[in-house]
Every structure is written in C-alpha cells, then in structure tokens.
Amino acid sequence: MLQSDIRKPSRLITKGEIDLISRFNILTPLAIAVLILTHAVGAQQPAIQKPAEKKAEEKATESAQKKTEKSVPPPVVTSKEIAKTATAEQVAESSILVYGGLIGGRQTLNQIRKTAIEKGKISVTNAEGKTEQATYQRWTQRAETLAKEKIRLELDFPNARYSLIFNAEKIFGIHEDQAFTPREDAARSFENNIVHGLEALLRYKENESKIELGAKEKILGVEYYLLDVTDKQARKTRFYISTKTFRVMMLDYQEDGRKFRRRFYDYNYAQGTLVPYLTILWADEKIIEQSEVGNITFGQKIDEAIFNAG
C-alpha cells in the first residue's frame, strides 16, 4: 500500500521562530514551568489588602497602563493568519527546515549530506511498454550548486550493467571501464531526475532559482501549496507541498509537450534528514519508473575517481 500524505500537526515557520527555536529550545520549557509554578503558588497564597491600599494600587496600575499603551507591541500573528498570507520564500524555507530535521534546516543538510551513497531497486518502462527490473547504486558528491555536483548512477539489469555519470554539467556512460555516449532518452531521463528533483527546491537559493507561489490546491482531501521553481536555464518544476507537513508529496514538469509527475511516498528520517523511500514517475498519466531505496548513508568518503571517464 502506498503511503499518502501523513497528516501531522504543522505550520508555516517564520525566520524569527527559527532563531527562537535554535536559541531557546531547551530554556523555553523550563521557563514556562517556572511561570506556571509561580502562578500556582501565588494563587494558593492570596494577599489581603486594605481598601485604601487597594484603591491606591488600582490608580497606580491604571497610570502605568496609560504610559505604556503606546509602547505595547502588536499582537502575535497566529500560524493560520500567516498561512493566509504566506510568501513563496516562507513556504520554501519552511519545507527546507522540515527536510533538515526541524532545527538546522539548510545548514544541517549541507553538513550531513556532503556525500550520499544510496542502494535500491528500480523498474523502468520503455517506449514499447516493456518493463525492466534492476538494482541500482548512486553516489553523490555535494557541491556549492546543483550544477557542480558529481553523481554516478550504476544500473545492474539481468543482461547488462552500466553507469551514468553527471560531472561538470556533462553526462556520459561507463561500461566495462570504457566511456560511451548514452542514448538521448536515457541521458535526458537521468538529467531530469537531477534538475527536476527535490534538490531543485531544497537548494533553490544556491542555484539562484526563481520561486513563485501559486494558489493553494486540494487534491483527494489534501491541501497543497503550489510552488514553482525555475532555474537559470529556465527549467521549471512545480512542487506540491503539504500545508500540514510541508513535505513535497509530488512535483510536475513538462518536456517536449509531455507532462511528467513524480510522487514521493514512505517518508522517513536518515541521519536526521527527511528522505522519501519510494518514488514513482508518471509520463502522461502512465507509470514509467518506480524506485525504492533499500539503504542510504550520508557523509562517507567517496573516491572521486569514480566520477571520471575511465
């Protein structure tokens, strides 16, 4: 059974709240407990005031309230009110914070995911409608921007084994230690997985991409923020971000008149960062790819020679 959007209580996160969480996430519960305890003790031991003292105190309180009336800060805006006027940046940054484990956000992702080694299973349906099964292994060397990353995807089919490599914005293949030029459709599919993937959102600032927030949309009872991310090559990806969890549940992009939709399921945490363990890709409402992560680790040393041609 495919996992749908997990409806956990969540809300839009402001930059001010991020600072408060990081600075006072330990002290705040203690402070609240002290305030509650103080209030309880005070309630149990009420002070007895004389009529004259009570009137004098009321006058002093009224005078103090008038003096400070102009300096009282505006009321705190609730999460529901923020959600009504959410900006593209607020939605994007809130989602990044969730994927980074709620505390570090972008900083945590950069620290933990310096490298990634992923293993799993994949099924691919070709243009003739034939589905092939394979195991895969993926190595990623993180860089300042998505375009500068180094990625190697090794595919092991029953009758063939080869690798596709993304390095210096170029794509080439390796078969039996020999470099080759992959078919155009295979190279394009590999590239789309990179430029139209989750990292396009999580690293929109580093990539200098433009973001635009559209109207919210409800699909099968689940409400989404629709966030468009367009990179410097004018490649646009629309992300459907849950208004409850701020997880990306699916994304859309178009190419050569075809509409592609990638859905994400089975979210779980790996080394404190959020990862979808099941991904399904549709092309014109037909499933053409399904991948399932078996194991993923971050931060391990990778020999950069594997990203070279031979």
Question: What spans do the regions from the language model cover?
Answer:
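Gly/Pro-enriched, hydrophobic low-complexity segments
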Residues: 52, 222-309
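Bacterial N-terminal signal peptides
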Residues: 29-39
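Compositionally biased, proline/threonine/alanine/serine-rich low-complexity intrinsically disordered stretches
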Residues: 43-86, 95
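Flexible, processing/modification-adjacent segments and terminal tails
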Residues: 76-91, 97-100, 168-235, 255, ...
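Short, ordered beta-strand-loop transition motifs
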Residues: 144-147, 215-223, 270-271
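N-terminal mature ectodomain segment of secretory-pathway/periplasmic proteins
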Residues: 75-179
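Bacterial N-terminal signal peptides that target proteins for export
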Residues: 5-30
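Well-ordered beta-strand positions enriched in small/hydrophobic/aromatic, beta-favoring residues
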Residues: 118, 151-153, 171, 211, ...
